[in-house]
């Protein structure tokens, strides 16, 4: 972002969004199916303390826009991401905290104690999830995550 920049959607983006809005329930249900599959099939790793699964508060409704897992630390996260990449799974770390991003370092300052921001960001992995994901693709992702985590932890 810089001076004079405009981030309003153009006509092409609006047309693309409109097509998605017309099928919003179908898209959401497809993504929810994948989300539930991941959650159910990774629950054993969670029960064994090898990773943490997403928490959706009771008063909230998920649209399944992403599925993440939290691993014990950045070392395990790095190994799991490498394993997934080597096995054709496009998983990524979730975010870089603003205070440690280049612009944050240059322009900002962290206020208070960094009790959670950095450590939590170093544990998160986002798994691939998309509309129309097949049962085979879902199982491939889960199998690779299980293999990677069991090899590391």
Question: Language-model segments: which ranges?
Answer:
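PLP-dependent aminotransferase class I/II
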Residues: 1-153
């Amino acid at each position: 972002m810089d001076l004079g920049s405009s981030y309003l959607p153009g006509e092409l983006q609006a047309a693309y969004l409109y097509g998605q809005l017309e099928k919003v329930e179908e898209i959401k249900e497809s993504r929810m199916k994948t989300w539930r599959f991941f959650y159910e099939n990774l629950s054993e790793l969670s029960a064994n303390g090898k990773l943490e699964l997403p928490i959706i508060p009771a008063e909230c409704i998920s649209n399944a826009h992403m599925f993440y897992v939290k691993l014990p630390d950045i070392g395990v996260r790095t190994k799991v991401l490498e394993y997934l990449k080597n096995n054709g799974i496009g998983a990524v770390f979730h975010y870089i905290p603003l205070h440690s991003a280049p612009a944050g370092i240059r322009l900002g300052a962290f206020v208070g104690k960094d009790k959670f921001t950095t450590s939590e960001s170093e544990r998160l992995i986002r798994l691939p999830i998309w509309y129309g994901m097949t049962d085979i693709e879902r199982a491939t992702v889960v199998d690779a995550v299980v293999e990677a985590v069991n090899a590391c932890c």
